[in-house]
């Protein structure tokens, strides 16, 4: 059902910004439907220490909403972005404040599509000193992320993307 809806959104004849927004709305509906089965709760910030890759348009929106200075990144191939982004794995998101997302209502798609299927949020810890640095089990986020990526690659193939901490370095 959602996959068909996403396919229609990706291929509909409307503005790119409108289609991106529709994918976000679908992602939020999926998250709401899954909520009773998830370990994710307010104050849990384990996923906020993962390598979080976002598009430049998402970074621009965060900069506009927060007033934070955004660093412009060049377009880079996927393999380069992945290697560079991994440098931030285990580090807190620049928008994490007191274990709360300070941009929750406007968070990027990747943040909306990662939900832990663990019994407890504590089991999601990626702290290697605790012997738990494996990503938590989750439903396949590609169900939401791949159509979004396809949409962006089709209409804005050279849009820069990278780790959220690359766009917003430092305090």
Regions inferred by a protein language model and the residue ranges of each:
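Short loop/turn segments that flank or connect secondary-structure elements
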Residues: 2-46, 50-171
């Amino acid at each position: 059902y959602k996959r068909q809806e996403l396919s229609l959104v990706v291929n509909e004849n409307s503005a790119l910004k409108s289609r991106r927004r529709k994918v976000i709305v679908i992602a939020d509906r999926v998250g709401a439907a899954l909520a009773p089965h998830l370990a994710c709760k307010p104050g849990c910030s384990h996923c906020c220490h993962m390598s979080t890759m976002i598009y430049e348009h998402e970074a621009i929106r965060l900069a506009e909403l927060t007033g934070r200075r955004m660093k412009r990144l060049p377009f880079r191939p996927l393999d380069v972005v992945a290697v560079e982004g991994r440098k931030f794995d285990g580090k807190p998101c620049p928008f994490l404040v007191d274990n709360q997302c300070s941009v929750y209502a406007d968070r990027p798609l990747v943040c909306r599509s990662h939900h832990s299927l663990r019994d407890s949020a504590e089991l999601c810890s990626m702290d290697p000193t605790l012997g738990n640095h494996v990503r938590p089990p989750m439903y396949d986020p590609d169900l939401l992320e791949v159509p979004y990526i396809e949409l962006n690659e089709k209409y804005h193939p050279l849009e820069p993307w990278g780790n959220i901490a690359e766009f917003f370095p430092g305090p």
